[in-house]
């Protein structure tokens, strides 16, 4: 009976860790996918100024800085789960907002909102994973978060490749 209970507990820990590590996946994905979207949002918003284009790309990182700065306070005040849920809501709002933005300022605003969510998750995901993991397996579980960041980067590069190929083909 005890062996079955341990197996169920480890399955639960794995599930928690994989869900929490989605913060890393989103961080890696969002960090890179904007590069592939660059020609599309530049054309859509009529961007010709390199500074404006750079702001569109880096604005999420400004939000990340803010999210990371407040993450410790949020974790101490509200625990780990609620701020992680809020980070997922912020990222979802960012995805929706950037998709429907009709003005460049709104596009940047929603990129910053998503950045705050990613900044929260990038600090809180490994913290939460470490807290729910058994001490003897903590390193393995926390490393999953870093792995998901790299998987997010890879996924974004693959998406960018799929987007860029048709654009390059139609340009010739």
Give the predicted meaning of each segment.
Residues 1-172:
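Transmembrane-helix signature of 12-pass secondary carriers
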């Amino acid at each position: 009976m005890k062996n079955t209970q341990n197996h169920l507990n480890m399955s639960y820990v794995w599930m928690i860790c994989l869900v929490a590590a989605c913060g890393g996946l989103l961080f890696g994905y969002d960090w890179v996918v904007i590069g592939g979207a660059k020609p599309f949002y530049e054309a859509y918003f009529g961007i010709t100024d390199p500074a404006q284009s750079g702001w569109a790309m880096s604005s999420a990182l400004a939000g990340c800085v803010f999210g990371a700065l407040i993450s410790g306070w949020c974790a101490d005040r509200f625990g780990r789960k609620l701020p992680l849920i809020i980070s997922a809501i912020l990222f979802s709002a960012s995805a929706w907002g950037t998709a429907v933005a009709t003005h460049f300022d709104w596009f940047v605003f929603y990129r910053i909102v998503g950045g705050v969510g990613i900044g929260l998750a990038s600090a809180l995901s490994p913290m939460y994973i470490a807290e729910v993991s058994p001490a003897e397996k903590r390193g393995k579980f926390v490393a999953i978060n870093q792995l998901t960041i790299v998987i997010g980067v890879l996924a974004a590069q693959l998406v960018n490749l799929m987007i860029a190929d048709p654009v390059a083909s139609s340009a010739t």
